[in-house]
Amino acid sequence: MQKKALNYCVSLLLLGCAATPAIAADLSIGDPKTDLGELKLSGFLRVKYQDKSWTENDHKLTFDAARINLDYTSPKIFGHLEYRCYQYNKLCDFSTLVDANVGYNINDSHLIQAGLQPVPFGPGRFWESNYYGGVITQIGLEDVHNVGLKYQGKFDTGTQVELAYFTGDGGSYSGPYSEDASRYTTNFVKPEDSSLTHLDEQNMFIGRVKQEIRSLPEPMKGNIGASYWQSDIENKTNGQTGDRQAWAVFGNVSYNNLGFGLTLGKNEMDNKDPLTPKTSLMGSFDDNFMVANEGMFYTADVSYKFKNVGKLDAVMPYAMYSSYVKSEDGYDDSSRNLLGVAAYYKNMSFVAEYIMGKNDFLIGGPSSSYAQGGDDDTHELLNLQFYYNF
């Protein structure tokens, strides 16, 4: 009942923001340089038009999603809240909390942060330039938000260190289809089929180190880094405890408006499940799916931003390759590749993406896509989006 009430309030707030574009240009009070700080409201409203190769479409422009950010900034204390809602059948029938955290600036170079926040694994929250995301998002390693405590330090050598401990995931929220997969982040979820094992990830120790490459000639910039993930996986069905160990190495290079990023790593999970020892049940965005417990992952991204193109502020074409190469013999690899372009004009964004997926549950694949696979076809999605940012 409380989640439904929160969902209703968010819907009203979003409609209010959409109806007042003049006010939405500056929804803030206070000054971030003073002890009282600044409180700022921001977000977006998004509509979409999609064409899918694997199913018939109604080809209608529909409301897709909305995001609300509430940020508090002061010299010492800061906080961040992000809430999103999506439309499946009706306005905001799936909604979820993404972030809710507070932090303390020890000084200009060191801080601590507590609450529901992004996990410091891989090059950043997002590993690519596009708006749809890579296939590793569904494996539960990219754009992950869990509950815990993080330390971040920046040093004169150009080194950034992040050390974090997460007690567990951010929980489930409100959706029309699934009891436990109504969440933004891909986590282990409670099965709706009683024959499947219920897993829960806890005690996550995660670290990331980034190093600026200062020897590059101007105007090149770049960094390299590595991250590691160690956690317990509680098998709630038989009471045993397994673990996850994952690592990633990454690098990013830019030359003026050209950017390139590469991430690779390995995911290895022991679920202590005699029934399905090679796969585990995970879920997000109101869907459940099985994921192979062991595999290598790869993401490559390239983009170029053209500034001041006619009346547009910028136009950015981009491309992505992402794959999950499973270690188990006979398992088909999962891949998602993308070509896209984004155009920006004042507080509006226009996005066009052509996405190709193979053994990708979100792009026409079966529910076993991220586990055994079994689909020899490549499916395509044309994804057109319009954003109003406030």
Q: Which positions does each model-derived feature cover?
A:
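Residues on the lipid-exposed face of transmembrane beta-strands in outer-membrane beta-barrel proteins
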Residues: 68-72, 100-104, 149-153, 207-211, ...
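Residues that define the transmembrane beta-barrel architecture of outer-membrane proteins
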Residues: 37, 57-66, 94-98, 143-147, ...
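Predominantly the C-terminal beta-signal and adjacent terminal strand-loop region
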Residues: 346-390
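Transmembrane beta-strands of outer-membrane beta-barrel pores
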Residues: 47-53, 65-67, 74-78, 83-89, ...
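Transmembrane beta-strands of outer-membrane beta-barrel proteins
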Residues: 39-45, 79-81, 112, 161-163, ...
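Outer membrane beta-barrel
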Residues: 30-51, 55-173, 210-216, 299
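Detector for outer-membrane/organellar transmembrane beta-barrel domains
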Residues: 207-213, 217-327, 388
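Solvent-exposed loop segments that connect transmembrane elements
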Residues: 171-196, 236-238, 269-291, 360-376
